[in-house]
UniProtKB/Swiss-Prot annotation:
Domain of life: Eukaryota
Gene: mdv1
UniProt function note: Involved in mitochondrial fission. Acts as an adapter protein required to form mitochondrial fission complexes. Formation of these complexes is required to promote constriction and fission of the mitochondrial compartment at a late step in mitochondrial division.
The protein's name in its UniProt record: Mitochondrial division protein 1
The UniProt record lists the keyword Transit peptide: no
Start-end of each WD repeat: 319-360, 361-398, 437-476, 482-539, 542-581, 583-618, 629-658
CDD domains reported for this sequence: Mdv1_N, WD40
Species of provenance: Aspergillus fumigatus (strain ATCC MYA-4609 / CBS 101355 / FGSC A1100 / Af293)
First-listed, main subcellular location of the protein, grouped into a coarse class: mitochondrion
GO terms for cellular component: mitochondrial outer membrane; mitochondrion; transferase complex
Native organism taxonomy: Eukaryota, Fungi, Dikarya, Ascomycota, Pezizomycotina
Bridged cysteine pairs (disulfide): none
Region described as Disordered: spans on this chain: 139-170
SMART domains tied to this protein: WD40
Coiled-coil features, chain-numbered ranges: 209-246
Length: 658
């Protein structure tokens, strides 16, 4: 390189001028040589011999002045203080930070100035600075100037116009003009800030969307890993249960036929007694699965829906071909069970939106159901209640086509898609047992722990022991016979929404907790029962139509009725805490810690915020195009942890954030 080598020359000096100079300060070797010659000649001239006539007395006079100055006490003190100063203090700059910055910015290379982008702003930087200054002093001065020349008018005096000097008016005009210009600059600055904030918000929305997609992928992967882990745990349990049986059976010697008969009879007796101990042992005879009930517990709950805006749709599924009569799920993005008037009960994976199988066994449509962990209870119009254990599921591929075309008919693409939509699997070995004590359709049920309560159109409530699998108590509503004729003659209690030509369900809704039972019936009353005594503890009167839904917690009980109202009761006082109404009868309702959701005969879900009392709509009917087909009416709703499910009249089930 030219900057790193020297050309050989007789003088030993470089003849090449370095472009950057020495020490980065622009000096070259030629400059240094010239400076050296000047110093040598100057020193020789000043300090030459005294006899030299060419040298004057300047040097001697200067040295004499310096000698006299050094003999002064003030100068000597300064010299002594300088000797005690450290080298760092000697080279330390005495300039302030602002002065250093000013000097550093006072000289800017042309290369940097050429890269400055052109500003499209209509005002200069100085104007923007002036616009940011507070005009408080101007307002004070303006008030003082405007108050000059004013005086208190006495009674009877007219308020005449006071003349002002032209110079004052011109100054006032110029001042107002400058302020008006500043207002324009401030407006432009605010507009620029708003555009900048909008751009930042748009970028943040894009980043949020990317992170949400990543979270969705993580939850999908988490669900897959938990599924694989559950399968491995089940296999390990099967191996541990079958391992002790093999050596025991191999080491048992053969006995006589008499002993064999006795052993068989004893085993049969033991099996009979063991089978009566638990309902979970009553499985089909062909099932080789373990009799132990397995519970699948998630290590972490899904949180994706918590980051969506309220009212956002998560997923939509064409679950059935007819009106949805009952839906329930265990937890957000978990397992959902749905029933409809197409006489099917389907199990769905809410994470993927796929149907995992069917629960077959009822002879009619299912009117009510409940999902708790892996246990599903279904109540049907065939007057039976069946329990299912989804952890024992064994899938068998089947075809559940409805209205299958004949062999001679051609199937177009749309028809084939519709038929393949409901081709799924049968969940065999899920059936546990059936409760068949009712004599009419089961319209409501609820179970908690080992107790299940069912309500039927036969005007009875039955309490079931899920350990023994039998009915332990029947609650006969004494006023059922008297109300039967009233319900048949009174037309105002006939529903006007879901089933206009059928009478209301006698037992519309119920819920139990330990020994407490709340039941809503067709007479509009809510009765609180004590299961220990079988007596009504309290009756809540207020609705004027049949009760269709209810739910309670530690403090409040919420009921929905065909009288179009939802009432919130205080269980401690037995009085109404709050109430509100909609335009149509309430067919379904549920609440969580924040909101109450209800199906009120419309194509949207009615949402009520407990905190601020705000009402808003959620569902496909919000913002729907009036020219297009309207969404179907919402019939059933379920809500857990802000995750909302709605079942519609056309068989569609959709998930929303709430």
């Amino acid at each position: 390189m030219a900057t790193q080598r020297r050309d050989e020359s007789p003088s030993g000096l470089s003849d090449i001028v370095e472009p950057d100079g020495l020490l980065g300060i622009g000096l070259t070797s030629r400059h240094i040589e010239a400076f050296g010659r000047k110093v040598t000649s100057t020193a020789g001239h000043l300090m030459g011999p005294i006899t030299d006539s060419s040298n004057g007395s300047h040097y001697h006079t200067a040295m004499a002045d310096i000698h006299r100055e050094l003999r002064r006490p003030t100068t000597q003190r300064k010299v002594f203080s300088l000797t005690q100063t450290s080298p760092t203090d000697l080279v330390r700059s005495k300039l302030s930070t602002s002065e250093i910055q000013s000097r550093a910015l006072s000289s800017v290379p042309d290369e940097l100035l050429a890269n400055i982008p052109e500003d499209s702003s209509s005002y200069s930087l100085f104007e923007g600075f002036k616009a940011t200054q507070d005009d408080h002093e101007f307002r004070k001065a303006h008030r003082r100037r405007s108050s000059k020349g004013k005086k208190l008018l006495k009674d009877g005096e007219a308020a005449g116009a006071l003349p002002s000097a032209p110079t004052d008016l011109k100054k006032e005009r110029d001042l107002l003009s400058r302020r008006l210009d500043l207002m324009g600059v401030r407006k432009n600055m605010c507009s620029s800030e708003i555009h900048e904030i909008d751009n930042k918000i748009a970028n943040l929305h894009n980043i949020r969307k990317i992170v949400l997609d990543r979270l969705a992928g993580l939850e999908m992967e988490e669900a897959e890993l938990e599924h694989q882990l559950t399968e491995i745990d089940n296999k390990l349990e099967d191996i541990q249960e079958e391992a002790p049986k093999t050596p025991l059976t191999a080491a048992t010697p053969k006995s006589s036929s008499v002993n064999d008969d006795s052993v068989v009879s004893e085993d049969a007796a033991l099996d009979a007694s063991f089978m009566s101990e638990s309902i979970y042992q009553k499985l089909p005879s062909h099932s080789p699965r373990s009799l132990k009930q397995r519970s699948i517990r998630k290590r972490s709950m899904p949180i994706l829906h918590e980051h969506f805006a309220p009212g956002s749709q998560i997923k939509e599924m064409q679950a059935h071909t007819d009106m949805v009569t009952a839906i329930d799920f265990d937890y957000p993005f978990g397992t959902m069970v749905s029933a409809a008037l197409d006489d099917t009960v389907r199990v769905w994976d809410l994470n993927t939106g796929r149907c995992t199988g069917f629960l077959e066994g009822h002879n009619a449509s299912v009117r009510c159901l409940q999902v708790e962990d892996n246990i599903v209870a279904t109540g049907s119009m065939d007057a039976s209640v069946k329990l299912w254990d989804l952890s024992r599921a064994r899938t068998v591929t089947r075809d559940n086509r409805l209205n299958k075309p004949s062999e001679g008919e051609g199937e177009d693409d749309n028809a084939s898609d519709a038929f393949s939509l409901f081709s799924a699997t049968t969940l065999e070995d899920c059936y546990v047992f059936s409760l068949d004590a009712h004599v009419d359709e089961v319209t409501a049920l609820h179970f908690r722990g080992n107790t299940l309560i069912s309500g039927s159109a036969d005007k009875t409530l039955r309490q079931w022991d899920l350990v023994k699998g039998r009915c332990v108590q029947t609650l006969d509503v004494l006023w059922a016979a008297a109300q039967a004729s009233t319900l048949a003659a009174d037309t105002q209690w006939r529903p006007s929404g879901r089933l206009p030509d059928a009478s209301a369900d006698f037992v519309g809704a119920l819920q139990c907790f330990d020994a407490a039972l709340a039941c809503g019936t067709a007479d509009g009353m809510v009765r609180l029962w004590d299961l220990r005594s079988g007596q009504v503890h309290r009756s809540l009167v207020g609705h004027t139509g049949p009760i269709t839904c209810l739910q309670f917690d530690e403090v409040h009980l919420v009921t929905g009725s065909q009288d179009r109202s939802i009432r919130i009761w205080d269980l401690r006082m037995g009085s109404i805490f709050d109430a509100y109404a909609y335009d149509k009868p309430i067919t379904s309702m549920m609440f969580d810690t924040k909101r109450i959701v209800a199906a009120a005969g419309e194509n949207v879900v009615k949402v009520y915020d407990k905190a601020d009392g705000h009402h808003w709509d959620c569902g496909a009917g919000v913002g729907a195009d009036e020219s297009g087909p309207a969404p179907a009416t919402v019939e059933r709703v379920r809500l857990k942890d802000g995750y909302l499910l709605e079942g519609r009249k056309d068989g569609t089930v959709a998930a929303w954030t709430c």
